[in-house]
């Protein structure tokens, strides 16, 4: 009996040992590193590994192997006779397509559904992919048909297909954790004459979130946007790419809660400082009006003063808007947004008129007389924004404007635009016209400032510090600092510089006013081109 019991115990231990031995390779992440058998068991394991990969030290995971596993999966689909794959984390459609198709092919990519072809006469899906007919006609070889695979993969919340950039950029994510793979006949299709279009539908994103169309670069093991363009729309984004691979839409927040609060404080402090110095500028102007005859007749100081007044009122309405609650009556928020919009447009207009006046004095020079010159400028600068605001208000464009951080928490609310098309047309477009005109005029004037001294003196001397200060002062008058929002990438450093410079524009104008109208003895005696330009800037137009 003892022997029988011993044998029984030994047999039990052997069974137990064997069971433990066979269980270990079934670790979902480890098994996927050992082969590429695309059966149902492996696919289900992959879904679990997506979640566990990189989140637990006890779940061995090679991110690179997992990513290669799925990049090779489309090749597996093209080589086999299956037509669809329908699993919770992967949906795929495989079709034989004629290479002489007569029209573009459209496929629906709705969530939780297998991709399907949209036939003629059906409504265009919210999520879909459009393949141009030229794609199939340009394939090498004399083929009558080719295999097409469209794969929608849920990459989960783990580290798979996140890439170094996405992992380092806190708060960034792939829209819905979804990748769309496109493959035709196992060919490396690049440089397409007509781009493929992948449409992603989504909720309206906070204004501090950037949407970028990207593809997975197998060589880098990271996301890349080369060859893809992003076309934003109302509730959807269209990605146009000149090659076939796995695509996704990245959401990258610019501001977190702490950064938004810091920028708000900088703006408030800068606006307060600007208002103080703008008030000093206006007091000096009034004093000069009574003591200097030139201030009663010359137009340049009047234009400077009009710009100062509009900037003062803009900063005042900004402080009121940011400091007031947007939860009051809708009519109150509408009025605050309209007033803020009006003074912003007035500032843009006066900066454009500063550039126009500078053009008359420094570029055109002759035949610059206009009757009632300043009155006409005032009617344009104060009247045109009224028409724009009325148009925006009649389309119900004003409302609560919310900025959220990457955790979808409200970081700032103010009364502003609630419709992006109106914002782009009446603010971005309006500013772009005045900015481009001012930039051209400033470039011509700067060229004159830096070349005139060497021409008049017959020497090749370089620009003096005074010439540089003159150009910087003129750039503040015509609003060049606002161009940071147009000509530079929208990064965190750019936002800080933009906020600081524009909130202190009133200080810069005050310094320019002092330098221009309080010349030192050496400046008065100077024969440099800068001094002559300053003198020209004070010529009367009446």
Swiss-Prot record:
> What PROSITE patterns does the record tag this protein with?
G_PROTEIN_RECEP_F2_4, GAIN_B
Q: Where is this region: GPS?
A: 213-257
Residues in GAIN-B domain copies? 107-257
- List the Gene Ontology MF annotations in alphabetical order: G protein-coupled receptor activity
- Per the annotation, which location comes first and is thus the protein's main one? membrane
Q: Which GO terms describe its biological process?
A: B cell differentiation; cell surface receptor signaling pathway; G protein-coupled receptor signaling pathway; negative regulation of CREB transcription factor activity; negative regulation of non-canonical NF-kappaB signal transduction; regulation of cell migration
List residues traversing the bilayer.
Answer: 268-288, 303-323, 343-363, 373-393, 427-447, 468-488, 495-515
**Extracellular side, ranges:** 19-267, 324-342, 394-426, 489-494
What disulfide bonds does the UniProt entry report for this chain?
213-239, 228-241, 333-415
Q: What happens when the gene is disrupted?
A: No visible phenotype. Mutant mice show altered follicular-versus-marginal zone B-lymphocyte fate decision in the spleen and decreased numbers of B220+ lymphocytes in the bone marrow. Adgrg3 deficiency reduces inflammatory responses in the kidney after renal ischemia-reperfusion injury or hypertensive nephropathy. Adgrg3 knockout does not impact overall metabolic phenotypes in high-fat diet-fed mice, but influences immune cell activity.
* UniProt keyword Disulfide bond present: yes
Carbohydrate-modified residues are 44, 96, 142, 408
Known regulation of its activity is: Forms a heterodimer of 2 chains generated by proteolytic processing that remain associated through non-covalent interactions mediated by the GAIN-B domain. In the inactivated receptor, the Stachel sequence (also named stalk) is embedded in the GAIN-B domain, where it adopts a beta-strand conformation. On activation, the Stachel moves into the 7 transmembrane region and adopts a twisted hook-shaped configuration that forms contacts within the receptor, leading to coupling of a G-alpha protein, which activates signaling.
Question: What is the annotated localization of this protein?
Answer: Cell membrane
Q: Which residues lie on this side of the membrane: Cytoplasmic?
A: 289-302, 364-372, 448-467, 516-542
How is expression of this protein distributed across tissues? Present in all these tissues with a relative high expression in the heart, kidney, and bone marrow. Also expressed in intestinal lymphatic endothelium.
Instruction: Sum up the protein's function in the record's words.
Output: Adhesion G-protein coupled receptor (aGPCR) for glucocorticoid hormones such as cortisol, cortisone and 11-deoxycortisol. Ligand binding causes a conformation change that triggers signaling via guanine nucleotide-binding proteins (G proteins) and modulates the activity of downstream effectors, such as adenylate cyclase. ADGRG3/GPR97 is coupled to G(o)/GNAO1 G proteins and mediates signaling by inhibiting adenylate cyclase activity. May also signal through G-alpha(q)-proteins; additional evidence are however required to confirm this result in vivo.
Tell what the record comments on domains: The Stachel sequence (also named stalk) in the C-terminal part of the extracellular domain (ECD) functions as a tethered agonist. In the inactivated receptor, the Stachel sequence (also named stalk) is embedded in the GAIN-B domain, where it adopts a beta-strand conformation. On activation, the Stachel moves into the 7 transmembrane region and adopts a twisted hook-shaped configuration that forms contacts within the receptor, leading to coupling of a G-alpha protein, which activates signaling.
The UniProt entry's sequence similarity note says: Belongs to the G-protein coupled receptor 2 family. Adhesion G-protein coupled receptor (ADGR) subfamily.
Q: How does it assemble?
A: Heterodimer of 2 chains generated by proteolytic processing; the large extracellular N-terminal fragment and the membrane-bound C-terminal fragment predominantly remain associated and non-covalently linked. Interacts with PRTN3; this interaction induces the activation of PAR2. Interacts with GNAO1 (when palmitoylated).
Q: What is this protein identified as?
A: Adhesion G protein-coupled receptor G3
Q: Which gene encodes it?
A: Adgrg3
């Amino acid at each position: 009996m003892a022997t029988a019991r011993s044998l029984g115990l030994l047999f039990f231990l052997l069974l137990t040992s064997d069971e433990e031995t066979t269980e270990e390779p079934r670790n979902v992440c480890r098994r996927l590193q050992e082969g590429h058998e695309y059966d149902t068991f492996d696919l289900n394991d992959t879904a679990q590994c997506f979640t566990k990969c990189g989140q637990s030290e006890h779940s061995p995971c090679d991110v690179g192997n997992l990513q290669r596993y799925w990049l090779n999966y489309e090749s597996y689909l093209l080589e086999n006779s299956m037509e669809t794959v329908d699993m919770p984390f992967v949906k795929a459609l495989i079709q034989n397509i004629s290479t002489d198709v007569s029209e573009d092919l459209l496929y629906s990519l709705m969530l939780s559904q297998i991709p399907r072809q949209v036939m003629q006469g059906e409504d265009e899906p919210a999520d879909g992919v459009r393949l141009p007919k030229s794609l199939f006609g340009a394939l090498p070889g004399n083929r009558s048909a080719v295999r097409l695979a469209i794969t929608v993969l849920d990459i989960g919340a783990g580290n798979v297909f996140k890439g170094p950039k996405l992992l380092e950029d806190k708060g960034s994510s792939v829209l819905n954790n979804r990748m769309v793979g496109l493959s035709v006949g196992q060919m490396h299709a690049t440089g397409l004459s007509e781009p493929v279009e992948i449409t992603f539908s989504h909720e309206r994103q906070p204004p501090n979130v950037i949407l970028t169309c990207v593809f997975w670069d197998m060589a880098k093991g990271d996301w890349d946007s080369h060859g893809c363009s992003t076309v934003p729309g109302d509730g959807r984004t269209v990605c146009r790419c000149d090659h076939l691979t796995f695509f996704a839409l990245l959401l990258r927040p610019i501001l977190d809660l702490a950064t938004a609060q810091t920028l708000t404080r900088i703006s408030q402090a800068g606006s307060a400082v600007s208002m103080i110095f703008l008030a000093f500028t206006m007091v000096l102007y009034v004093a000069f009006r009574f003591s200097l005859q030139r201030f009663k007749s010359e137009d340049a100081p009047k234009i400077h003063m009009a710009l100062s007044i509009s900037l003062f009122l803009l900063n005042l309405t900004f402080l009121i808007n940011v400091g007031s609650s947007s939860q009051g009556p809708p009519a109150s928020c509408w009025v605050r947004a309209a007033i803020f919009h009006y003074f912003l447009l007035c500032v843009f207009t006066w900066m454009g008129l500063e550039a126009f006046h500078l053009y008359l004095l420094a570029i055109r020079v002759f035949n610059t007389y206009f009757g009632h010159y300043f009155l006409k400028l005032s009617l344009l600068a104060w009247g045109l924004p009224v028409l724009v605001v009325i148009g925006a208000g009649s389309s119900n464009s004003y409302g609560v404007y919310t900025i959220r951080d990457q955790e979808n928490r409200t970081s700032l609310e103010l009364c502003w635009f609630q419709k992006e098309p109106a914002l782009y047309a009446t603010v971005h477009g309006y500013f772009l016209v005045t900015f481009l005109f001012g930039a051209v005029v400033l470039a011509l004037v700067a060229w004159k400032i830096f070349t005139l001294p060497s021409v008049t003196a017959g020497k090749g001397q370089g620009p003096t510090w005074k010439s540089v200060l003159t150009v910087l002062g003129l750039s503040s008058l015509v609003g060049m600092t606002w161009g940071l929002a147009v000509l530079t990438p929208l990064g965190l450093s750019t936002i800080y510089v933009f906020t600081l410079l524009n909130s202190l524009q009133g200080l810069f104008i005050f310094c320019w006013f002092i330098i221009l109208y309080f010349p030192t003895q050496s400046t008065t005696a100077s024969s440099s081109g800068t001094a002559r330009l300053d003198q020209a800037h004070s010529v009367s137009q009446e």
